From Swiss-Prot:
Involved in DNA repair and RecF pathway recombination. GO terms for cellular component: bacterial nucleoid. GO terms for biological process: DNA recombination; double-strand break repair. This is DNA repair protein RecO. InterPro entries: ARFGAP/RecO (IPR037278), DNA_rep/recomb_RecO_N (IPR022572), NA-bd_OB-fold (IPR012340), RecO (IPR003717), RecO_C (IPR042242). Belongs to the RecO family. Keywords: DNA damage, DNA recombination, DNA repair. It comes from Alkaliphilus oremlandii (strain OhILAs).
Amino acid sequence: MLITTEGFILKNRKFGETDSILTIFTRKAGKITAIAKGARRPKSNLLAGIQPFCYSEFVLYKGKNMYTVSQCEAKEIFYPLREDLKRLSYASYLVELVEAVTTEGQTNHRLFNLFGKTLFLLKKSDIEINPIVRAFEIKLMNYLGYKPQLMSCVNCDSKETTAWKFSATEGGLLCSSCYSADLFAMKISNTAVKLAIFLLMKDITEVQKLKISDHLNEELKKILKQYILTHTNKYDFKSLEVAEKL
């Protein structure tokens, strides 16, 4: 069976003398594994479109164990990402996230579109990286079915409290009367709550110029990191560690 679909290259591994094994996040088939035969030959028609991050259009043959790339045309190479180590590291973090949370063969059109928009934003030189990455994280959790409750207490639905905490296990805010519902819940400021709501509700293209303080970014980053860990069991994102040192 042949299918034609757009997709992003998440991973490219050498196989044999001239072949490549690809992990592709596609619009029509979700995350797939595919072999690109002869793709590493210098004159291969597939070579340009199978580089990491590439957004390409593929003609794929579905075999018993994996797909075979019959044709591939690069639509966007994302050269600016490759020329800036910090942007490259954050883009690699997004790839790690998507690969960690997606299931082979399961489509997620909203996540596919979000991933594409975010990569296109990261290649621009005049954007604020931190709010874009935080927006991607919180929207990703929403699209996986873990939308955090940020408008009221997840336990009693109260909208008022002396101080909020965020419970990764309960999936949202806890008011001061409900702290006992999760003894490991993390303190979260009212400003961070408002920022999280903004990032969750707005299209990611609307946050590209948003400026947030390092303190606020760090607060929300820690909370989202715990939230992602709780629901994906993925903690060690090497690319994020590299990006944050730059």
